[in-house]
Amino acid sequence: TLGVLLVATAAWIASPLLQSGSSEAGKIMANGQRQHQIGSVSFTVIESSAQLEQFLTQAKEQKKLVLLDFYVDWCISCKEMEVNTFANPEANQELQKFVLLQADVTKNSAENQALLKRFGLFGPPGILIFDLNSEELKDQRVIGYMPPQRFVERLKKSLGN
């Protein structure tokens, strides 16, 4: 009975994180692209390297840095990043300065696996930032959960502030 009680308690604690912000709840834009809204920012959902290259090219033309968030629906740390970090008002304000992409690798398709492999990631959460030349700022990479204030500092450093 103690085991059942522990499992029930863990499920109760995790339930708000699991219920918030499922990527499937995102809206579909006129161009067919899926969006994932977090606070006042919207991530464009991608699933392949080809899509990433398309958005990196657009961001270069717009002279904006790109933030790529690797995500799966069942990842507790991904949900913590959404609820605690991305939704933080200061983080949300800084995120608006980036082209925001979210690699939803929930399906674990061949394209998803290739995207993870391209950057040497085993799985989410992982956040990569690309400069104006579409090169990853490897020293700014975030693996796992990061609290809001540290994340804001990382974003500001990436932007040169």
Predicted regions and their residues:
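Proteins that catalyze or organize thiol-disulfide redox chemistry
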Residues: 1-99, 103-161
